């Protein structure tokens, strides 16, 4: 651990020194490059430069007519002065004299030609030495100097008179261009003027300073190169020391960092050989398998993967390109079995100790060792690729070789040195010996994130690729059988380990016939057409929603169009659901016309269109279906209407003839008149029956007993006395028994009367049972039902007498429809008469209780009575429960007092109606008579 830390510190110090020293060396090199001596301006060079300037001038799109003006006003003295400063030599001015050469060139034209020269690509000639390449910094310095000198000249010319001197030809000169494109280095004139030094105003002083400055260029270059070389050598020595230290330290670790072998991928590997590595879960290794258009396979592994065995199966016969692992991936064992042809293997930097074993059939293998920039010195030429020697034939895959210890990947890759010899490490356990060819290796598992399927497993020796494909294609595809697979556990014995492979054999042909997708039954043409419709484009005639709903309903009912056609022609009974479905989703007139005109194949239509196309050939098919539906539904509908009429008739009779209901109405009327004494509501002779629903709203002084409770208790008492008298009459034969005589008997108590009266009043709901049924009915609905039956009968009769008569058809449907119309006319006529009769009966019943109401209330009377009966049953239950819970009172000492309290139980609750108690006996007597 300390050694690794020391290496990292040494590497960090080396990198810091290189970062500090390389800029100084580079600066010296740049100074030396900028001080390259330009050639002397000879007449030949001036002419060549003039031609190049003219060519550049035209190429830049400038006006050629102004070229002569530029030649007259542009002085070559500027170029000569710059060349003297740059080279430190005394260059003679051999250019001819031109009058007016000292004139000042305009600012726009001067900037235009300088910008143009800085953007051109042309070769410069340097005397007899031929072509010579100048650096971009040299051209930048030359053009910047031209801009500065011209700016100073223009400012000096305006202030100082023109001096006498030998003019120079006005041809435009160019700096020595390079053989590759240079960036535009011309800067704006204002920036050039600001950056010009003040020493340039004095030419003699400036020349001396430039010579002193240029004289130190070469020493700076030598110093920079020396420092860079020393740093580079130190870096190389440090890398060699690190490689040697890593190799020596790894001798003590015989276990490889990572090993991917075919044995690791099998689930039956033993624990002694290491746990199998799941490649999908490795965070370090990520192999990408990408298949191109031609089936090329690229396997890419990330940095840091070592000892990787890449096995190419036999089926990879197309050209494959193996993308190598990046730097740091060492000890790559690539085994190419037979059939792996045209393999291009590229090894980048850091991939050392590559052991490639090519068995028979591995032909045309191109191994390209690509070294990145910086790994070799500039003087080292690229070596041509070396073809590998022929590989002997192998009967079985070779044993994996000893893995090399991994090398640490440094951030700055050093030049590729010759690797030291690999140390001898303990090899992994050898594979089991086999006399014959071993089993095929399993293919590498599919990597996560890869959508491509992995290649099939390799074949056995001697087998052909086409044999597997033919065998797979020959097998018929069967229906899937969904189950949950269980992974075999090699650590323990399972029941599946005891199953023998040859103990059970099944009939392959029978399985294909039973569970195959492709049906071999050719007798049913309709099923074959329906099964093949998915492969073709179906023709849609109906509305999509209508077609879908009709197809779903027909599939659920399971009726064929031929059965429908036969039933319609013979007049047989069809399911009502089927007829309603066909009528509901019947096609429109336009859709029906298109179905009739369709003359193509039926299998080209959808399921709904096929069904309708078959049955639509029958004339008036939907009118026939409507008639069949009416024939099927009429008996049931007529029976329901007749039963409703009977219920109403019985309910009216029960309500008019119920004695107990009449007694209840009498009690309510007398109680209401007594409570309304002295008001305009008193003295009533009758009341509407909906008043019965208001009895529970009036409560007594105790806050619990309502007026309905009071009325029920009174009726319970009176009905109890009456029941007792009726029982005695039957036993003794006496025609009349007074109530006072009953009260004199001490054995008769109040509880006995309550029990008898409570049974009588509780039976009122059972007595008016048909009234409750009549309350459920709807008079308007009954009227509409009868009217609908009559309308359907008229429509069917019209269809029979007009449409069917025009066809002159003598079929079973025609005969049955004629008989049905004749019979149904009598039934529907009877229903129409009964409906009128029932309406009159209900109206008479309502008038019997309410008088001449004036408006038709329908069956509301029965609804009111039904609700009142529900309230009455509830009160009777409360009274019955109260009688059980209440304590039994002790009998009074005087029989007269007990009789008096029995005779007047209502005085305590409602004293105002005490005088009415005297009439109770007479009322009971009247009822008895």
Curated annotation (Swiss-Prot):
The keyword rRNA-binding is assigned to this record: no
Gene Ontology cellular-component terms listed: cytoskeleton; membrane
Xref: Pfam families: FH2
Subcellular location: Membrane
Compositionally biased residues, Pro residues: 382-447
UniProt feature, compositional bias: Basic and acidic residues: 191-215, 738-749
Gene Ontology terms for molecular function: actin filament binding
All residue ranges annotated as the FH2 domain in the record: 468-898
Transmembrane spans: 222-242
PANTHER family linked: FORMIN-LIKE PROTEIN 5 (PTHR23213:SF269), FORMIN-RELATED (PTHR23213)
Record protein name field: Formin-like protein 11
Gene that this sequence comes from: FH11
């Amino acid at each position: 651990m300390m050694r690794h830390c020391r290496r990292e510190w040494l590497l960090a110090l080396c990198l810091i020194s290189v970062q500090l020293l390389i800029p100084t060396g580079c600066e010296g090199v740049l100074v030396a490059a900028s001080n390259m001596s330009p050639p002397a301006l000879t007449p030949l060079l001036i002419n060549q430069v003039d031609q190049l300037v003219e060519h550049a001038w035209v190429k830049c799109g400038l006006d050629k007519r102004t070229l002569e003006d530029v030649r007259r006003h542009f002085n070559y003295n500027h170029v000569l002065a710059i060349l003297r400063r740059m080279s430190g030599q005394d260059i003679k001015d051999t250019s001819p004299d031109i009058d007016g050469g000292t004139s000042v060139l305009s600012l726009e034209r001067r900037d235009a030609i300088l910008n143009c020269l800085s953007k051109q690509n042309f070769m410069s000639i340097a005397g007899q030495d031929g072509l010579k390449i100048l650096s971009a910094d040299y051209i930048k310095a030359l053009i910047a100097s031209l801009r500065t000198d011209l700016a100073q000249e223009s400012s000096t010319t305006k202030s100082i008179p023109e001096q006498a001197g030998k003019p120079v030809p006005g041809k435009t000169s160019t700096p020595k261009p390079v053989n590759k494109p240079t960036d535009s280095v011309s800067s704006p004139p204002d920036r050039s003027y600001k950056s010009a030094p003040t020493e340039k105003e004095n030419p003699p002083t400036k020349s001396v300073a430039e010579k002193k400055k240029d004289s130190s260029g070469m020493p700076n270059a030598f110093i920079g190169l020396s420092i860079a070389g020393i740093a580079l050598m130190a870096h190389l020595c440090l890398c060699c020391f690190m490689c040697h230290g890593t190799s020596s330290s790894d001798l003590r670790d015989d276990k490889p960092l990572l090993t991917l072998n075919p044995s690791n991928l099998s689930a039956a590997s033993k624990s002694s050989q290491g746990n199998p590595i799941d490649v999908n879960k490795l965070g370090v290794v990520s192999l990408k398998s990408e298949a191109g258009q031609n089936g090329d396979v690229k396997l890419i592994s990330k940095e840091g993967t070592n000892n990787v065995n890449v096995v190419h199966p036999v089926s990879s016969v197309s050209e494959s390109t193996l993308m190598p692992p990046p730097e740091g991936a060492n000890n790559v064992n690539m085994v190419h079995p037979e059939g792996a042809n045209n393999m291009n293997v590229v090894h980048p930097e850091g991939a050392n100790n590559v052991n490639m074993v090519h068995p028979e059939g591995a032909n045309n293998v191109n191994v390209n060792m690509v070294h990145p920039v910086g790994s070799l010195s500039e003087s080292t030429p690229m070596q041509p690729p070396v073809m590998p020697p022929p590989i002997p034939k192998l009967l079985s895959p070779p044993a994996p070789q000893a893995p090399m210890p991994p090398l640490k990947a440094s951030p700055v890759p050093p030049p590729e040195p010759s690797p030291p010899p690999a140390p001898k490490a303990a090899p992994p356990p050898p594979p089991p010996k086999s006399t014959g060819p071993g089993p095929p290796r399993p293919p590498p598992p599919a990597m996560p994130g890869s959508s491509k399927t992995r290649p099939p497993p390799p074949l056995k020796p001697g087998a052909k690729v086409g044999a597997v494909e033919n065998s797979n294609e020959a097998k018929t595809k069967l229906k899937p059988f969904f189950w949950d697979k269980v992974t075999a556990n090699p650590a323990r014995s399972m029941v599946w380990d005891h199953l023998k492979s040859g103990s059970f054999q099944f009939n392959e042909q029978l399985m294909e016939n039973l569970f195959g997708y492709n049906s071999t039954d050719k007798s049913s043409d309709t099923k074959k057409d329906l099964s093949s419709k998915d492969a073709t484009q179906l023709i849609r005639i109906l509305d999509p929603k209508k077609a879908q709903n009709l197809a779903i309903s027909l599939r659920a009912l399971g009726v064929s169009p031929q059965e429908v056609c036969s039933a319609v022609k013979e007049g047989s009974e069809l399911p009502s659901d089927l007829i309603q479905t066909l009528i509901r989703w019947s096609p429109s007139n336009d859709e029906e016309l298109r179905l009739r005109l369709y003359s193509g194949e039926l299998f080209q239509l959808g399921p709904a269109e096929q069904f309708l196309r078959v049955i639509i050939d029958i004339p008036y098919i939907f009118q026939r279906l409507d008639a069949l539906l009416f024939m099927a539904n009429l008996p049931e509908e007529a029976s329901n209407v007749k039963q409703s009429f009977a219920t109403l008739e019985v309910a009216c009779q029960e309500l008019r003839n119920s004695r107990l209901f009449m007694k209840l109405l009498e009690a309510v009327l007398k109680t209401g008149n007594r409570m309304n004494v002295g008001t305009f509501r008193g003295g009533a002779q009758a009341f509407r029956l909906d008043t019965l629903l208001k009895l529970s709203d009036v409560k007594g002084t105790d806050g619990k007993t309502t007026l309905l409770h009071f009325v029920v208790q009174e009726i319970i008492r009176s009905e109890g006395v009456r029941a007792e008298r009726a029982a005695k009459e039957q036993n003794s034969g006496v025609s009349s028994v007074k109530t006072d005589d009953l009260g004199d008997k001490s054995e008769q108590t109040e509880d006995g009367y309550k029990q008898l009266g409570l049974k009588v009043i509780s039976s009122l709901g059972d007595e008016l049972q048909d009234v409750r049924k009549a309350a459920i009915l709807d008079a308007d609905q009954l009227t509409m039902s009868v009217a609908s039956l009559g309308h359907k009968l008229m429509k069917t009769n019209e269809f029979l007498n007009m449409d069917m008569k025009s066809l002159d058809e003598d079929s079973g449907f025609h005969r049955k429809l004629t008989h049905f119309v004749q019979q149904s006319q009598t039934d529907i006529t009877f229903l129409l008469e009964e409906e009128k009769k029932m309406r009159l009966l209900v109206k008479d019943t309502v008038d019997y209780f309410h008088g001449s109401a004036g408006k038709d209330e329908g069956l509301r009377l029965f609804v009111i009575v039904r609700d009142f009966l529900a309230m009455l049953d509830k009160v009777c239950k409360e009274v019955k429960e109260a009688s059980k819970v209440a304590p039994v009172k002790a009998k009074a000492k005087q029989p007269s007092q007990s009789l008096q309290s029995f005779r007047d139980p209502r005085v305590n609750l409602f004293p105002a109606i005490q005088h009415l108690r005297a009439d109770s006996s007479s009322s009971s007597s009247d009822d008895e008579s």
